[in-house]
């Protein structure tokens, strides 16, 4: 059957636009593909192909390539020559490696499916897929989201379910067009504040992680769907505790003093700081107290308040209150807090 389909395609020569060899028990990609220079769609899914043929690189008009459910062990170098490619399916293989430079020529790629493989990391070159709108890497062995991925300005849908990801980089704020983010069953402990900058985000699924609290401003996201079941969220169970006195390190005292002068636009301090880029970088990470609005650097009180999820959100069952993080600079400010703000008990 496969041979007959291939013969038919070859008879069409330059006029052949589509070749489908889905589930034909093929173990080797046909080298005669070079005789189909105007091929647009090549479907080779559900076979036993372990290596692509060199002739694949001649299919420069190809817009869709499906090699899903085969035996590939890497994303092959030949793919980088498919400069017209828009859709690439490599799901269900044994891929543990992406050949160097393979993404360099795929400037038109809008959809990439690498589900069900064995990837432990992604190359920096992932950031060169500038047209990508859909990326799916479910059920791999990823531990990190590379910051280069966050430069994909057109990305609207990102699937990273069932990996081993521990944290989300703050650079996620650059995914301005992201509408759907799926992070089910990872090892994520917290979401960065920068996720609250994703104005177009509508669907967020973080079920089955180890998140206890959400960043300040999280409740203002314009979500339509939010799922967080299977996370050990903080519960509203207040109890009385004795408050110690504020004891700051000399470094924190100095940092707060300098930060206060910077807020006043003190010209002398501003000029001095410009001469010390490392100090400037550290001070740029300062936060503000939610009570007095004064800046602090490395020492503060972690607090939580509870808000009801938006009525516009489709949410996990039984989610009544969302624990949202807030920071207080001192016990003095903590005493002036809103009654709905609680300190977080330290074990």
Swiss-Prot record:
Alphabetized InterPro entries for the sequence: Leu-rich_rpt, Leu-rich_rpt_typical-subtyp, LRR_dom_sf, LRR_domain-containing, LRR_R13L4/SHOC2-like
SUPFAM superfamilies: L domain-like
Sorted UniProt keywords: Leucine-rich repeat, Repeat
Entry annotated with the keyword Repeat: yes
LRR repeats (start-end): 15-37, 38-60, 61-82, 84-105, 108-129, 131-152, 154-175, 177-198, 200-222
Pfam families reported for this sequence: LRR_14 (PF23598), LRR_8 (PF13855)
Keyword Hydrolase in record: no
Annotated signal sequence range: none
Family membership noted in the UniProt record: Belongs to the LRRC69 family.
UniProt protein name: Leucine-rich repeat-containing protein 69
